[in-house]
């Protein structure tokens, strides 16, 4: 299955909105985690250590399906993210053995 990277960049109220919607964001990703389709997920941080976005590397059937994952994420829906980008990627390291 193809691999995609979702990069969400927070808007000006990102920190406050993250706190409010974090549990829904994590719950939304959990089915993908349970299915073994998430390779990596976590916040992007500023030099001061504050979250300023998120990155999720995950498997999806195609770009359209990956975009649905990004567009329906609670951080996107609730305005945490000012922008969301989804691109197909290729895992080079560590070597994918699946």
PLM feature spans:
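Conserved, structured core segments of small domains
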Residues: 1-98
């Amino acid at each position: 299955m193809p691999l995609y990277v979702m990069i969400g960049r927070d808007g000006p109220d990102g920190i406050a909105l993250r706190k409010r919607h974090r549990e829904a964001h994590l719950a939304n990703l959990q089915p993908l985690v349970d299915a073994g389709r998430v390779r990596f997920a976590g916040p992007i941080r500023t030099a001061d250590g504050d979250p300023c976005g998120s990155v999720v590397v995950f498997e999806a059937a195609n770009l359209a399906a990956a975009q649905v994952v990004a567009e329906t994420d609670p951080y996107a829906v609730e305005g945490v993210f000012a922008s969301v980008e989804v691109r197909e990627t290729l895992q080079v390291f560590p070597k994918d053995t699946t």
